Regions:
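Hydrophobic transmembrane alpha-helices
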Residues: 1-42, 46-50, 54
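Hydrophobic alpha-helical transmembrane segments
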Residues: 6-11, 38, 46-53, 70-74, ...
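Lipid-exposed faces of alpha-helical membrane segments in multi-pass integral membrane proteins
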Residues: 11, 15-19, 54, 58, ...
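Interfacial aromatic-anchored transmembrane helix boundaries in multi-pass membrane proteins
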Residues: 17-31, 53-87, 127
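Hydrophobic side chains within alpha-helical segments
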Residues: 23, 33-37, 75-78, 118-121, ...
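Transmembrane alpha-helix boundary and packing residues in multipass membrane permease domains
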Residues: 37, 56, 80-84, 115, ...
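Structural signal for the C-terminal ends of transmembrane alpha-helices
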Residues: 41-46, 82-91, 156-163
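Membrane-embedded alpha-helical hairpins and interfacial helices in multi-pass inner-membrane proteins
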Residues: 66-70, 92-172
């Protein structure tokens, strides 16, 4: 890993940590989701997994540790892998519409996967799953809408910098 890539990843982790902590008052609206998924969609799965693991670990010092941290890392990792394969192995067209749909659907699926993991850990009862999932649907919708809005308003414009295709120039 060269210095430019390491610096870019460290910067992405810092952005994700700061925004995750500061946006924690808005349920499930996170720049982190979009950055992890866009890295995976743009064939940088290794970077996606690194940013995911580091961000979740560091933010847990501020927001609290628990079994859910592992679930979040696994969930975002799984969604990153799924998007990586859809766009890079199965050849899904990479345009703004498909990326918006991918980050939106991934935001919704995030809640489903987290709920499944919690039910298997806590009780394994189908009724507890239905109750937990019904309670999480408004947050999942919020996550989906937030991901799409963040992608269209911010990430789309910065995508080439996030993926390292463009670099910021020094002003001398």
């Amino acid at each position: 890993m060269n210095t430019k890539k390491l610096t870019r990843l460290a910067s992405l982790c810092a952005i994700c940590v700061v925004t995750r902590i500061n946006f924690s008052i808005i349920p499930n609206v996170q720049i982190l989701s979009d950055i992890i998924l866009i890295l995976a969609i743009d064939a940088r799965l290794d970077e996606s997994l690194i940013v995911n693991a580091i961000t979740m670990t560091v933010t847990s010092f501020f927001l609290g540790f628990g079994y859910w941290v592992l679930f979040q890392v696994l969930d975002f990792g799984l969604l990153g892998i799924i998007n990586y394969f859809l766009f890079n192995k199965l050849g899904l067209v990479k345009n703004d519409i498909s990326k918006s749909l991918a980050v939106g659907i991934s935001g919704f699926l995030y809640g489903l996967i987290i709920t499944l993991m919690e039910v298997f850990l806590v009780s394994g009862n189908k009724f507890s799953f239905l109750g937990l999932y019904a309670g999480s649907i408004p947050f999942d919708i919020n996550h989906m809408i937030g991901n799409i809005a963040i992608y269209l308003l911010l990430i789309r414009k910065l995508e080439k910098y996030i993926t390292g295709e463009k670099i910021f120039k020094n002003i001398d």
